[in-house]
């Protein structure tokens, strides 16, 4: 976790104006936000590597917003200054005192710096101070650091080994295998530049050479030799000999050949610089322990890879190992690789002995034995003493040379031992420093471990809390699932109940609809029945009123008949004149009693005559109600009259209007005890004979009404001939009962013969006027009307002598009694005429009923 940001007053104690100028370059509009691209372009001018800049960005933008505000940009500038000053890039180093950051840009105010004494050295003062601190931490010995001590520091940079080897070669300016303070600063400077993706130069540029090293002349390709060891004290003993030699030389007694060999000038090395650099890279890769030497085991694979023989490789190894140490330094390894390259590429065999230009530069400081040997025997002067002295001098010189050789060998051994001791000391110091570093790392690891333990404990607590919460949530989820399941089951049951209720509701609604339809149909049927009942009641009332009138007429007729009987019987001794007067009186009485009624039949002469002017105005004369068949289209009683809309349009098919009985199922008068008036009678029909037919054989009795009086109560004629004998069709008893309605179920049967069958041949009432057109029979031929009897004359004639022709005409019960008499069947106020709309006696134009007429009645208008 990133440390909390430090206030700006502590982060930037000085140089606020400089930081403000930097911020103005990236945010000239002062929006308070610096984008990632603008900040990256500006920070790259610092010369730092992308890795360091990425770390700086992460620290400056800890929340990962993708941009920097003013405070974050100041933190980034401060971290850049830390990196340029050699400090670690962390937020904890923001409080350190350090120079402001520098950016390679013309607009940067730090590009132009005042000249100083050390301005020509590339290592800045602050870097030098930092490198000096690191140098002191490595515990240098006599101001020098060996390769073993510098190696861990260089390895921490994670640079490739060849780059680190090149850095070592460039920084070891005096080639002594150690780095002093300035050389270490150069090495660290090169390492930091390499970390910033800058290439390491092949040769050290003059700007990187420390000022302390520039006083020495460095020849190209030459390397300064190690400082020689101080001469031993006993070497001073050879001074007299030198002096004597000098004296001898000055006297010219010795040959110039016997003088000491002079120092030879420095020659170039046979190994080219480019090959040397390439061989050095191979050496750094081979020198895994970085001790500056490679053993035979380390280079064996490289040498064997060349394909040369082992003897030749052993000879090359012996030539390169000039000091016979069993190891090769960097220059010796380069020389050996040069010999192998010459043999492989050019076929040049290595020499047997090294020439002066083949000796590595680091090995040229040690003089080899004088190949000329000691001083040669001088020319003999002929003086024995001088010759002895010369020989003694030569012997002393040889001894001196051998002693010097021994001294050099001893000094070399001492140097080797000292070097070994130094190396052991270095190893000890290195191990000590490594131990200290390990201890520090151990302490850091322990601290981190403690911190991790604390975090682990916290995480365990958090984990336990989370687990507890998970358990609680799991229990809650399980309980919720249980509730959901129960609710789902309840919901399902409720849905089932709802579906059942809906189905029951639908069924009830359908049943309600059916009942409503049935009720509606029943209401329509009831209304129809009520209308029919009302119409029937009206007809009954009319029939009752007419019946009462007929009763009165009958009584009057009976009284008249009784008077006639009395007159005829001679009870009062009256004459025929009195009988005629009585007849006239009865006629007047009848006319007076029936004056308000209009008999539609009037008299037979008028009834059956063709003179329409003598007849009473017929209400059915202007329009024939039977001109068209009202039931031609459809039979209203064929089926259920309430099955469909009773007001719907009638069907066009021809059906029987009385095909179905509307009272078949429910007769409102079924429970009455009185017999049906229209029920089929077992007795003879009173209308089987025509009352208007003339009796062919009159009885001997002069009374024409003795046997054929239809209104006589004491008539002895048979019940079959008397239409009113036993059963009065207009009696009050039949209409008082509840079963006074006609039985329409028997309408299809042929009706009995009517009272007009004898006179009209049964055509008057033989057919049902409401019968279908197909069932209507043809009418019989018309017969002339019977002649009426002559009225009695004024002469008195005995009763015994009277014949049928002389018998006075009996009053016609259907004859109108007065001029103002009306039709008893005509509709009155308060009475309904059942035949008001359909007149069965309307005249017909044809003798036979036509197909267009549905009437089954005979046409009485043409009967004469």
UniProtKB/Swiss-Prot annotation:
PROSITE patterns: EF_HAND_1 (PS00018), EF_HAND_2 (PS50222), EH (PS50031). It is a peripheral membrane protein. Transmembrane segments: none annotated. The modification Phosphothreonine is found at residues 366, 577, 797. Disulfide bonds: none annotated. GO terms for molecular function: cadherin binding; calcium ion binding. The modification Phosphoserine is found at residues 107-108, 229, 244, 253, 255, 259, 362, 371, 374, 377, 560, 593, 666, 672, 697, 717, 734, 793. The modification N-acetylalanine is found at residue 2. This is Epidermal growth factor receptor substrate 15-like 1. It comes from Homo sapiens (Human). The gene is EPS15L1.
């Amino acid at each position: 976790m990133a440390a909390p940001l430090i206030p700006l007053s502590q982060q930037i104690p000085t140089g606020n104006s400089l930081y403000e100028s930097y911020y103005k370059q990236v945010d000239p509009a002062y929006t308070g936000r610096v984008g990632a691209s603008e900040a990256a372009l500006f920070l790259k001018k610092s010369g730092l590597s992308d890795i360091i800049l990425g770390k700086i960005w992460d620290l400056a933008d800890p929340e990962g917003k993708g941009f920097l505000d003013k405070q974050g940009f100041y933190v980034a500038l401060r971290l850049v200054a830390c990196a340029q000053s050699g400090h670690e890039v962390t937020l904890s180093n923001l409080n350190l005192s350090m120079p402001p950051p520098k950016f390679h840009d013309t607009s940067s105010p730090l590009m132009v710096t005042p000249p100083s004494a050390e301005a020509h050295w590339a290592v800045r003062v602050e870097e030098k101070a930092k490198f000096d601190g690191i140098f002191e931490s490595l515990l240098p010995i006599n101001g020098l650091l060996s390769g073993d001590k510098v190696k861990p520091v260089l390895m921490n940079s994670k640079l490739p080994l060849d780059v680190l080897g090149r850095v070592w070669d460039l920084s070891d300016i005096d080639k002594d295998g150690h780095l002093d303070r300035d050389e270490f600063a150069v090495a660290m400077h090169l390492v930091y530049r390499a970390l910033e993706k800058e290439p390491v130069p092949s040769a050290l540029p003059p700007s990187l050479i420390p000022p302390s090293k520039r006083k020495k002349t460095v020849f190209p390709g030459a390397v300064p030799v190690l400082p020689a060891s101080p001469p031993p004290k006993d070497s001073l003993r050879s001074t007299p000999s030198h002096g004597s030699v000098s004296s001898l030389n000055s006297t010219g007694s010795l040959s110039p050949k016997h003088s000491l060999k002079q120092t030879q000038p420095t020659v170039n090395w046979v190994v080219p610089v480019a090959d040397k650099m390439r061989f050095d890279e191979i050496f750094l890769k081979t020198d895994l322990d970085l001790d500056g030497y490679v053993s035979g085991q380390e280079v064996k694979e490289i040498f064997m890879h060349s394909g040369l023989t082992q003897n030749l490789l052993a000879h090359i190894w012996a030539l390169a190992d000039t000091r016979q140490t069993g190891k090769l330094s960097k220059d010796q390894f380069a020389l050996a690789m040069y010999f192998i390259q010459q043999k492989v590429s050019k076929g040049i065999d290595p020499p047997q002995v090294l020439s002066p230009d083949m000796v590595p530069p680091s090995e040229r400081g040690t003089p080899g034995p004088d190949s000329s040997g000691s001083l040669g025997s001088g020319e003999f002067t002929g003086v024995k003493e001088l010759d002895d002295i010369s020989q003694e001098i030569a012997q002393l010189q040889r001894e001196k040379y051998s002693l010097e050789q021994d001294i050099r060998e001893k000094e070399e051994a001492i140097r080797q031992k000292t070097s070994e001791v130094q190396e052991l000391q270095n190893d000890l110091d290195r191990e000590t420093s490594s131990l200290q570093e390990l201890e520090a790392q151990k302490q850091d690891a322990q601290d981190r471990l403690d911190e991790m333990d604390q975090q682990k404990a916290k995480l365990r607590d958090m984990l336990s809390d989370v687990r507890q919460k998970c358990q609680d949530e799991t229990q809650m989820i399980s309980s919720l699932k249980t509730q959901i399941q129960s609710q789902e089951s309840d919901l399902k049951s409720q849905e089932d109940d709802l579906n059942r209720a809906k189905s029951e509701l639908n069924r009830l609604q359908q049943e309600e609809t059916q009942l409503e339809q049935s009720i509606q149909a029943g209401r329509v049927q009831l209304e129809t029945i009520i209308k029919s009942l009302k119409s029937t009641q009206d007809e009954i009332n009319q029939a009752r009123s007419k019946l009462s009138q007929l009763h009165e007429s009958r009584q009057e007729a009976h009284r008249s008949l009784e008077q006639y009987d009395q007159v005829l019987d001679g009870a009062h001794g009256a004459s025929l004149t009195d009988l005629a007067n009585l007849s006239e009186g009865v006629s007047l009485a009848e006319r007076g009693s029936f004056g308000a009624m209009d008999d539609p039949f009037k008299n037979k002469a008028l009834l059956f005559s063709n003179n329409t002017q003598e007849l009473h105005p017929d209400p059915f004369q202007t329009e024939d109600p039977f001109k068209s068949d009202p039931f031609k289209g459809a039979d209203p009683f064929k089926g259920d009259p309430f099955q469909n809309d009773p007001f719907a349009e009638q069907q066009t098919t021809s059906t029987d209007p009385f095909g179905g009985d509307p009272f078949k199922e429910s007769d409102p008068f079924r429970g009455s005890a009185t017999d049906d008036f229209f029920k089929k009678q077992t007795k003879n029909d009173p209308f089987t004979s025509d009352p208007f037919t003339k009796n062919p054989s009159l009885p001997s009795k002069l009374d024409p009404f003795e046997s054929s009086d239809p209104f006589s109560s004491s008539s002895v004629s048979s019940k079959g001939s008397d239409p009113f004998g036993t059963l009065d069709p207009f009696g009050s008893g039949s209409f008082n009962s509840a079963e006074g309605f006609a039985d329409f179920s028997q309408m299809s049967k042929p009706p009995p013969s009517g009272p007009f069958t004898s006179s009209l041949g049964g055509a008057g009432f033989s057919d049902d006027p409401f019968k279908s057109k197909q069932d209507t029979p043809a009418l019989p031929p018309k017969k002339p009307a019977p002649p009426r009897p002559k009225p009695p004359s004024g002469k008195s004639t005995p009763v015994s002598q009277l014949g049928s022709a002389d018998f006075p005409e009996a009053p016609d019960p259907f004859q109108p009694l007065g001029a103002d008499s009306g039709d008893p069947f005509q509709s009155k106020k308060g009475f309904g005429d059942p035949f008001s709309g359909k007149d069965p006696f309307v005249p017909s134009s044809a003798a036979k009923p036509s197909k267009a007429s549905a009437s089954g009645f005979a046409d009485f208008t043409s009967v004469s």
